[in-house]
Amino acid sequence: MKLLISPAKSLEFKKELPSKITTTAVFEKEASYINSVLKEKSPQHLSKLMSISEALAELNWNRNQVFKTPSDSTNSRAAIFAFNGDVYTGLDAYSLSEKQIEILQEKLRILSGLYGLLKPLDVIRPYRLEMGTSLKLDAHKNLYSFWKNKLTEQLNMELKEGELLVNLASKEYFSAIDEKAIQNTIVTPHFKDFKNGKLKIISFFAKKARGMMVRHLIEQNASTLEDIHSFTSAGYAFSSTETVDEMNPIFVR
C-alpha cells in the first residue's frame, strides 16, 4: 500500500527532531531547476504570481536566494517534520515509533510543487510553491504540465503489483498525476460530518482526518481495503450506506 498526501504551506524548522535520519529526494535536480526560475522573480512578481502579501513575498524571495540542492544541515530537515498543516497535525509524526517511521518511509509519499514527490525522510529546505501556481518552465505552461509524466512514471515504478494507492491528497495536488495511467487501484477516502442535519465535507476536519487515516494505516501496517474501512479515529466510522463506490469509501461522524 502506498499513501499520497499534499504538503503544507505552514512550515516548522525549529522544533527538536525525533530522528536525524534523512534521505534524498528523487527529483532533487528538478527542484534545483525550478528554484533557478523562481530565483529570478522579484518579490513583487512573487506576490502577484502566488497571490501572497508583500511580507510573504519578501520571505520567499529570500528563501529562493539561499536555496541549495543537495541541502546541507543548515535550515533543512526531513519533509515529514517540516510540514505543519492540518493533515500533519492529524498524523502527528513526532510521536511515531522508530519502527513506525520506517513503515511511513516505505508507504507514504508527499506531493510537492517544488520537489515533485517526497518520501517522509527526504530532506527539504523552506519553500513556498503550490502545485496550482501558474509558473512557466521552458515548454511547460505550468507545474501540472511539468510534473504529470514524471510523477506518474515514478509512482508506477514504486507501486508493486496489486498494491493499493490511497489518495489522501487534495484535488489541487492529485491533479498533478495522470490518474488513468496509474496501473494500480486507487482508493480515495472521503470524510463527512453531520452539520445542521446534513452530511458535509468540512475542510478543516477532513484535512485532519486524512492525517489520522495515514497514522491508522501506518500503525496497522495496512495493505487491504478492509484495513482502510477499520479506521475509527476521532469518532469517524466507515459508512457502507453512504458509500456508493468502494474505491471512494465514505467515513462519517
Specify the residue positions occupied by each region the protein language model found.
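Acidic metal-coordinating catalytic centers involved in nucleic-acid phosphodiester chemistry
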Residues: N248
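Internal, well-folded beta-alpha domain core
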Residues: A93-D245, R253
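Active-site helix-to-loop segments that bind/position phosphate- or nucleotide-bearing substrates
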Residues: L4-S95
